């Protein structure tokens, strides 16, 4: 991975790194020394702002075992990590077993107890729409997270991915399929309870207290350029998307031979529009009509009209200060989801896609 960082430094030669994210796989298995090695390579090959957001993804079962020495969180902090993303999913044994998670309720709570002693910037993942999860248990799940004092929650509806253990269980009648009506009820509870506890619903699946939004994911949602390092990692610029090969042995071999182990595709204007629409509609910032290519602007306004009439979307007029002049303001029209439309954001975006 250090070799890939070195080979790709020209891609961001004119950019400044603001966030670093250790995610995918099980990055929490990295030692303090391995994290330091990667961060050193980033600082040596790229321009990095002072105090960038550096997030590490971790699961409770990994952390609770390694935290027995009570040093793992201190080591992460010393290595440079300043934000933790912990895949709790649920604080209840029944849910964790049904989702085939490796950790249990006790480990989830122990992990957060230790983590909050060393980090104040922590996000937890929670899953809703789990069959047999009552509305009351979902409220309790959220309350436990609030009681731990976490400042950010990422929450997603349970989905059954093809060719997974859960998929097999559902097909064989061993596990009920998720119910969309229940998921919608849980989503409404999630929105209401997080708001009561001072969280801002700034992206469909993300809730943060002021100053604790995920800077890394926000950059992604706002269409900023990023590069992904390691097998299967994806990268994005406004006009291109690339992805690394998944096979570890082939990935290493290509780099040893001085080759970049990736494939790429050029994004058409339609692709760029659809990408912006999909991410923009999920956020509180919406889709700026000023940023939409002129050739697609009126088509978007026209095609969104039926969803506006149904109370799912709204176009708001906003005044923003000009970046080039403090005395000048720019008028903009911004397409956003309404409270009623939030749960349907992805479906609404796909209905508005431009397909050639």
Sequence positions of predicted segments:
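Short, amphipathic alpha-helical interaction segments positioned at domain boundaries
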Residues: 340-356
